[in-house]
Curated annotation (Swiss-Prot):
It comes from the Bacteria. Pfam families: AcetDehyd-dimer (PF09290). GO terms for biological process: catabolic process. Its EC number is 1.2.1.10. NAD(+) binds at residues 156-164, 275. The active site is at 125 (acyl-thioester intermediate). GO terms for molecular function: acetaldehyde dehydrogenase (acetylating) activity; NAD binding. This is Acetaldehyde dehydrogenase 6.
Length: 299
């Protein structure tokens, strides 16, 4: 069966790394790569025999055939303008910006729940790294509040990431609740200027029932790490989950802290850019499921 035609809009760090990952996905054939200025990403696409243009989405939507799936790695504001145009032409969009137009998807949590949606949000890099852990806890104990802190190498944060900091914190905090299963969520991002650059590190704090089964939570966390490692091999715990008994101000709840690190695969981006790598790996996994659904093939 022929693979589904796809396009990448935004040939920056994320878009170019995504292209490398999609080359390993049998259900997808990237036919177009689009930007608004000439770039290394466009040149790399052309070198692979892919139609690439700096003519933007206007150029893309004039092509024949049109792509069936678009992966957008531009900015939240750009995607808000482009998304209605894709929808009008029945092009499914996988949104790697924090625009959050469609339902939010995290592969090990709700990969197939929104497979027919015209637009799916990949949340943020911090969301893809930490929401699996919040979900791992919330499937064992009620989580009235969860907070995530994502620390990424400053050198690995391009202009798109920096321009979207506000959207990052808002969208990630919302997803910690809606997708992760916490009653309330909050997100913080830190751009770490250390040289040489450090790989992505994340801390997840979840309030839990005072009598929650700690062994069951730990087992759930370790099981979830294995699920994420199926598509992000560099995803790992830095230590076993750490538990705290209830303290003043915690309304009788205990707390679990989970410490993560994410090393990139090194496809296009350096290995320290695990924050970007987990986004592209998750998007490739979601795109594969969407493509197989369109083909009528089990994911």
């Amino acid at each position: 069966m022929e693979p589904i035609n796809a396009a990448i809009v935004g040939p920056g760090n994320i878009g170019t790394d995504l292209l490398a990952k999609l080359e390993r996905v049998d259900s997808i054939a990237v036919q177009y790569v689009v930007g608004v200025v000439e770039s290394d990403g466009l040149e790399r696409a052309r070198a692979k025999g892919i139609s690439a243009s700096a003519g933007g989405v206007d150029w893309l939507l004039e092509q024949d055939p049109l792509p069936e799936i678009v992966f957008e790695a531009t900015s939240a504001k750009a995607h808000q303008l482009n998304a209605p145009r894709y929808h009008e032409l029945n092009i499914q969009a996988v949104d790697l910006t924090p625009a959050h137009i469609g339902p939010m998807v995290c592969p090990p949590v709700n990969l197939t729940h929104h497979i027919d949606a015209p637009n799916v949000s990949m949340i943020t890099c911090g969301g893809q790294a930490t929401i699996p852990m919040v979900h791992a806890v919330s499937r064992v104990s009620a989580v009235p509040y969860a907070e995530i802190v994502a620390s990424v190498a400053s050198r690995g944060a391009g202009p798109g990431t920096r321009a979207n900091i506000d959207e990052f914190t808002q969208t990630t905090g919302q997803a910690v609740s809606e997708v992760g299963g916490a009653a309330r969520g909050r997100a913080i991002i830190i751009l770490n200027p250390m040289e040489p650059p450090m790989i992505m590190r994340d801390t997840v704090y979840c309030m839990i029932d005072a009598d929650a089964d700690r062994d069951a939570i730990s087992e759930s966390v370790h099981r979830m790490v294995t699920e994420v490692q199926a598509y992000v091999p560099g995803y790992r715990l830095r230590a076993d989950p750490q538990f705290d008994d209830p303290k003043d101000g915690w309304d009788g709840h205990g707390r679990v802290a989970i410490f993560l690190e994410v090393e990139g695969n090194g496809d296009y981006l350096p290995k320290y850019a695990g924050n970007l790598d987990i986004m592209t790996a998750a998007a490739a996994r979601v795109g594969d499921s969407i493509a197989r659904n369109r083909m009528g093939v089990p994911a």
